Amino acid sequence: MNSAELTVIQEAVLKRLPALGLASHARILDAPCGSNAALSLALKEHGFDAIGADIDASSAVRLGKNFVEANLDATLPWPDQIFDAVISTEGIEHLENHYSFLREIHRILKPGGTLVITTPNITALRSRVRFLGSGFFGRDARPLNETARHPLHHIGLATFSELRYELHLSGFQIKEALHTHVKPISYLYSIYVPFIWLYTLVAFRKEKDPKQRERNREIRAALLSYSLLFGECLMLVAEKR
């Protein structure tokens, strides 16, 4: 496989893999794998037992028996506890039901298995300003076309806090909240950082539950991190509990 086929997001995921402590020949599901299945092929070249899955069957041309046609909004076609890791790049934002997807991933992961998700970072400062002005986040400059439903529509964009809640409710524990890449234009929005710092400090203090206050400290630290303020895409690494 030509490494030039990898997107900047897929490259970031691939570079992060050594830090995840996966065994050689670990079984990894890449879902959705996309029409060119570039990440699935790269995983195989790195020695992993990689399976690609997508609603678009064209990936079968490149993956052969290592491809499974699957609707990620439905029950996944694998038995329980079969994968060591699942990688989902730029997929969850296209799904109708995050919870059913995450619970299915939880089901097919082995105990202690790893889930890596990337998704547009609508928590980023640039995206927040776009929403303030237009009512739409950075990835969608105008309303979705209601007359022509498309699998690539961003129907499930979510903030970091929402994704954290969904993951924890689905049986995962977030280990890392990273970014895949940063565009230089994002630094122009640094002027808003002091306001965000002060606003979250005041807002989060209103929580009365001591256990949630502890969790809110984690959430606020993430919200004020370089990755969430400036990253184009989130990369969340979570572990099956």
Language model segments and positions:
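Short catalytic micro-motifs in class I SAM-dependent methyltransferases
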Residues: 90-94
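S-adenosyl-L-methionine-dependent methyltransferase catalytic module, highlighting the catalytic core
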Residues: 4-6, 96-104, 108, 114-239
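Conserved phosphate-binding and hydrolysis motifs of nucleotide-dependent enzymes
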Residues: 84, 112-113
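Conserved N-terminal segment of class I S-adenosyl-L-methionine
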Residues: 1-79, 85-89, 99-102, 156-160, ...
